[in-house]
Swiss-Prot record:
SUPFAM superfamilies named in the record: Homing endonucleases
Post-translational events: The N-terminus is blocked.
Effect of residue 346 to D: In strain: D273-10B/A and NCYC 74
Similarity comment text for this entry: Belongs to the LAGLIDADG endonuclease family.
Subcellular location(s) per record: Mitochondrion
EC number: 3.1.21.-
Lineage of producing organism: Eukaryota, Fungi, Dikarya, Ascomycota, Saccharomycotina
Listed name of the protein: Endonuclease SceI small subunit
Species assigned in the record: Saccharomyces cerevisiae
Name of the gene: ENS2
Length: 476
């Protein structure tokens, strides 16, 4: 038997997947042939000549992505029609995140061992590949069972997978050729817990400007449930504060659904610590007036009875915008798919941040600080309620924010990971042709990784470790 190299085996695996899709297509009703299968099947069929020129790492990433879809098919015998495959709001998303890298490492070991072995192996190549598939189906099921019994362990794996993705994507600017981007920067991977005091309070000031309220009783910061890690880290950093779960009243059909978390800062010790550190780090008149209106309630604070003044520091040189974006900003990674072909998919990454009219000066502050056109600020809404939105899409505009967020954005949560996808897709837009096909495939892969809301059961197991308090009137 002629010995094959790893690249040949990987290409055989792609052929095996094509045949697998063919069988699914023949044996399933048309309504079960969902969009993800259609796209992946056509992409494989149309681009085999491109794959032959790829290196092994690219092919392994491609196979990793495709295995995820096949694995979903095995786990969900009835595929979901008219829904994105990875948008299911349950714990399966977390199990799959861990499964990705297990599969990738398993494939590497199996194929490397086979490639380095002698010629006396009796297995044929297609039999080997089928055995790999069967082994993975069995072993990943056991992994999921173990992880589902320990949510904290599962979350730990999730964070580790983030770091691996970050490491992989961090190499993109240095290892790939771009047409019009000259960028040598790298992600500064840290969490809120890693910031020094000055950096943390810059970040906290921005977060309070967006999602905070300063009242006579203290400070309340409310974050969406998707940003639970961010909330927990901030609560841990502040100390002497209370973490409270919140439920949406409108979700009567699911009374256990956690919608948001609040950090309540009410003790005098915590309030003195926060106020003295954010006192002159605010940019909006709205939040400054909240402090001014409640100064009598804080007469015990050592702030010399001076009214706060508006911050005049350059927001490009501190963590304020990172905190403000965590509250009210979004990193989007949409894709434009022309009608004529799947091959020329275009990326449409964008950075969006909005504020109500009473705080529109913050939008103009960002626009001026990053030297953007006034046309980037749009007024949206109806006659009674208007929002001011900053919207950026051109590569030059997006690169200005990438230079900033690479340096100042803490990475540990859903919105921060959306930034990684946004950043990656911005670079994809400027790939030269040799790398563009691979970039588009990898972008599809990265964009399918999402964090959705946990259901109450898993939230409860996780949050109880952090002493979250349930709201008054909660009925178990």
């Amino acid at each position: 038997m002629k010995k094959q190299n790893l690249n040949s085996i990987l290409l055989m695996y792609i052929n095996y997947i094509i045949n697998y899709f063919n069988n699914i297509h023949k044996n399933q009703l048309k309504k079960d042939w969902i969009m993800e299968y259609e796209y992946m099947y056509k992409f494989l069929m149309n681009n085999m000549t491109c794959f032959i020129k790829w290196d092994n790492n690219k092919i392994l990433l491609l196979l990793d992505m495709y295995y995820n879809v096949l694995y979903n098919y095995h786990k969900q015998r009835t595929p979901m029609s008219n829904k994105r495959l990875m948008n299911s709001k349950n714990i399966m998303d977390y199990k799959l995140l861990y499964t990705y890298f297990y599969i990738l490492n398993k494939m590497k070991m199996e194929m490397d061992n086979y490639n380095n072995n002698n010629n006396n192996i009796s297995l044929k190549y297609n039999e080997l590949l089928k055995n790999i598939m069967n082994n993975l189906n069995y072993k990943t099921s056991n992994i999921e069972t173990n992880l589902s019994n320990n949510f904290y362990l599962m979350d730990k794996y999730l964070i580790n997978k983030y770091m691996k993705y970050l490491d992989m994507l961090n190499m993109i600017p240095n290892n790939y050729m771009f047409n019009n981007i000259n960028y040598k920067g790298k992600l500064n991977i840290k969490t809120v817990l890693d910031l020094n005091n000055n950096e943390f309070y810059d970040y906290l000031s921005g977060l309070i400007e967006g999602d905070g309220y300063i009242g006579p009783g203290g400070i309340t910061i409310t974050n969406h449930a998707n940003d639970v890690l961010n909330t927990i880290f901030i609560n841990k950093r502040i100390k002497n504060s209370i973490l409270v779960e919140k439920w949406m009243d409108t979700l009567k059909d699911n009374p256990y659904f956690v919608n948001a978390f609040s950090i309540n800062i009410k003790t005098n010790l915590a309030k003195e610590k926060i106020f003295t550190n954010i006192y002159n780090k605010l940019y909006s008149d709205y939040k400054i007036n909240q402090i001014n209106n409640h100064i009598p309630y804080y007469n015990y604070l050592k702030i010399n009875n001076k009214l706060p003044i508006k911050n005049i520091m350059d927001i490009k040189n501190n963590y304020w915008l990172a905190g403000f974006t965590a509250a009210d900003g979004s990193f989007l990674s949409s894709m434009y798919n022309p009608k004529d072909t799947l091959l020329f998919k275009n990326m449409r990454p964008s950075y969006v941040i909005s504020q109500v009219e009473t705080r529109k000066e913050l939008i103009y502050l960002i626009q001026e600080s990053f030297d953007l056109s006034i046309s980037n600020v749009k007024k949206v809404g109806n006659r009674k309620l208007k929002d001011f939105k900053l919207f950026t899409r051109t590569t030059d505009e997006l690169m200005k924010f990438i230079y900033y967020f690479d340096k100042f954005l803490p990475l540990h949560d859903n919105k921060q990971f959306n930034y990684i996808k946004f950043r990656f897709n911005t670079f994809i837009k400027s790939y030269n042709w040799n790398n563009r096909v691979f970039g588009l495939v990898l972008s599809e892969y990265i964009n399918n990784i999402k964090i959705d809301n946990y259901d109450y059961y898993y939230y409860n197991k996780y949050i109880n470790m952090h002493n979250a308090r349930k709201p008054k009137g909660y009925i178990k």
